[in-house]
From Swiss-Prot:
Location relative to the cell: Plastid, Chloroplast
Record-stated family: Belongs to the universal ribosomal protein uS7 family.
Record SUPFAM superfamilies: Ribosomal protein S7
Name of this protein: Small ribosomal subunit protein uS7c
Any one Gene Ontology BP term: translation
Species: Chlorella vulgaris
Lineage, broadest ranks: Eukaryota, Viridiplantae, Chlorophyta, core chlorophytes, Trebouxiophyceae
Origin: domain of life: Eukaryota
Gene3D superfamilies documented for this protein: Ribosomal protein S7 domain (1.10.455.10)
InterPro entries: Ribosomal_uS7, Ribosomal_uS7_bac/org-type, Ribosomal_uS7_CS, Ribosomal_uS7_dom, Ribosomal_uS7_dom_sf
GO molecular function, one term: rRNA binding
Length: 156
């Protein structure tokens, strides 16, 4: 076991426009090379496009998209007696949210040919409808955890 003290959780202040911690987490994951103002611009432009496309509050759509992409279980490799098992574990709510945001943004970054705001808009709308690549990734993780349910006894 580690002898260090456990690190305190950092408090995430809400973003200035929507007053939402979730949007701030999205912006922080979106940021590259310390360019936070660019990340804000991309995020807010994407949310404006979501509002135009759905005629609804974009914050509700973003929350729905992240909720649909959030995994409930994940698998972790555990080495026992010379063989490695994929052990299914429940995901804490903060980690689940972080994974969902990360998956949505990684799907956006893999696509090419359009501005990031357009790609983020498309993926958020897809995830809100319970489709899209981020939701498919969550389903794959759930299937893998279900297939390895027998190894749940080796939980950490």
């Amino acid at each position: 076991m580690s002898r260090r003290r456990t690190q305190k959780k950092r408090i995430v202040m809400p973003d200035p426009v929507y007053d939402s911690r979730l949007v701030e987490l999205l912006v922080r994951q979106l940021m590259r090379e310390g360019k936070k103002s660019l990340a804000y611009r991309i995020c807010y432009e994407s949310m404006n496009r979501v509002a135009d496309a759905t005629q609804q509050d974009p914050l509700v759509i973003v929350e729905q998209a992240i909720r649909n992409a959030t995994p409930l279980v994940e698998v972790k490799a555990r080495r026992i007696g010379g063989s490695t098992y994929q052990v299914p574990l429940e995901v804490a709510s903060e980690r689940g949210t972080a994974l969902a945001i990360r998956w949505i943004l990684s799907v956006c970054r893999k696509k090419t040919g359009r501005p990031m705001a357009a790609k983020l808009t498309a993926e958020l709308l897809d995830a809100a409808k319970n489709s899209g690549l981020a939701v498919r990734k969550r389903d794959e993780i759930h299937k893998m955890a279900d297939a390895n349910k027998a190894f749940a006894k080796y939980r950490f």
